[in-house]
Amino acid sequence: MITLYNTLTRQKEVFKPIEPGKVKMYVCGPTVYNYIHIGNARPAINYDVVRRYFEYQGYNVEYVSNFTDVDDKLIKRSQELNQTVPEIAEKYIAAFHEDVGALNVRKATSNPRVMDHMDDIIQFIKDLVDQGYAYESGGDVYFRTRKFEGYGKLSHQSIDDLKVGARIDAGEHKEDALDFTLWKKAKPGEISWDSPFGEGRPGWHIECSVMAFHELGATIDIHAGGSDLQFPHHENEIAQSEAHNHAPFANYWMHNGFINIDNEKMSKSLGNFILVHDIIKEVDPDVLRFFVISVHYRSPINYNLELVESARSGLERIRNSYQLIEERAQIATNIENQQTYIDQIDAILNRFETVMNDDFNTANAITAWYDLAKLANKYVLENTTSTEVIDKFKAVYQIFSDVLGVPLKSKKADELLDEDVEKLIEERNEARKNKDFARADEIRDMLKSQNIILEDTPQGVRFKRG
């Protein structure tokens, strides 16, 4: 039974899907005007783990995460670089996939883009105007915030609280300072689309409402994103979506905490933004992922090199213990009376599931993984090893690895994968068979340069890493 903290109710709730056995999940993705920073990477990693755990528990997860490919920041960037908005977006969408792929974040079921849904967005806004929830003014379209009775329920603020400090900027034609933009009138030289309200482009909030509706329907199970999106972005999404669809927008809202840099909030003014594109040149991406999930997703994380080094050391400890188990697997035999170890491994697995069932507590899940490694180290020190116990260890290690998304073996950027090595060995065997010894020697030397040693055995050629 999975429980999660619902920002909407401010309490943990038992997860009950709309459709048995299925999870419909929408995660707010990046505005693709630059490489992502470590703060953008956190939700990608955290909600990837959530998805993986649901799948481990047998759910079919439809995981949708959008790209905002038209926005003020993109327009400004395109003007700075003298490139079109689509060109900028394409570049950084590709960079996003590369960066999060390095962090072992699995591809979403769907990555909708704003530009691909422009007709849907325009129709959605038109529907809101027709229903009286929105109005056109001076070429812009605004949402009537006060007309939606539930406004403020996610951020737990009242309309009266919000009214304090609300203002109408120069050039805006709002009925009320609390109203927010659905459609922006085109400015000279900016990318725009034709609509019943005139040339323009959508506001940020309406985009996610429409893409979520198009991809997942009127009501979704889980909507997730960073804490900074709770207000006004997610609050406005609820207002638009529920006014339009006459149904709850999302049953559960999840928000991850911030990442601070050396105990200071990331900000452009401080110049302490750290791009994932740059970090992974210096820090193993597996270590970075392990570092992020070593803290509960709702808690803030402090990023500094000392803490990253601690994560590297912890992951190395886990991997070293797994390597010992793999080595013992070569000499393991069928030994009876090993139930004590089987029971201890099962107890650790049960604890892992218990803490993951409790709002996806990856910090405590990693503690369980450390305990598994400690037990494994103790076991391999014994003179005899049981095939049953070794297989049990390996199976549970693999479960932890799959759920948390942290590989059990390090993959250096220039390191060949095992399947690649096997293919090269097959090619070398074929070359030798055809008496193409030059090619056979070339392959052997290439593998040797990667510290891969070939060994001839009665069962054929095998390899080991030096």
UniProtKB/Swiss-Prot annotation:
Cofactor note as given: Binds 1 zinc ion per subunit.
Keywords, ordered alphabetically: Aminoacyl-tRNA synthetase, ATP-binding, Cytoplasm, Ligase, Metal-binding, Nucleotide-binding, Protein biosynthesis, Zinc
CDD domains found in the cross-reference section: CysRS_core
Binding-site list for Zn(2+): 28, 208, 233, 237
A biological-process GO annotation: cysteinyl-tRNA aminoacylation
Position of sequence motif 'KMSKS' region: 265-269
Cofactor: Zn(2+)
Superkingdom of the organism of origin: Bacteria
Broadest EC class assigned to this enzyme: ligase
Record EC number: 6.1.1.16
Pfam families the record matches: CysS_C, DALR_2, tRNA-synt_1e
Catalytic activity: tRNA(Cys) + L-cysteine + ATP = L-cysteinyl-tRNA(Cys) + AMP + diphosphate
Binding-site list for ATP: 268
Subcellular location: Cytoplasm
GO CC annotation, single: cytosol
GO molecular function (one): cysteine-tRNA ligase activity
Motif mapping: 'HIGH' region: 30-40
Family from the record: Belongs to the class-I aminoacyl-tRNA synthetase family.
Subunit structure as annotated in this protein's UniProt entry: Monomer.
The protein's name: Cysteine--tRNA ligase
Species for this entry: Staphylococcus aureus (strain MRSA252)
Gene: cysS
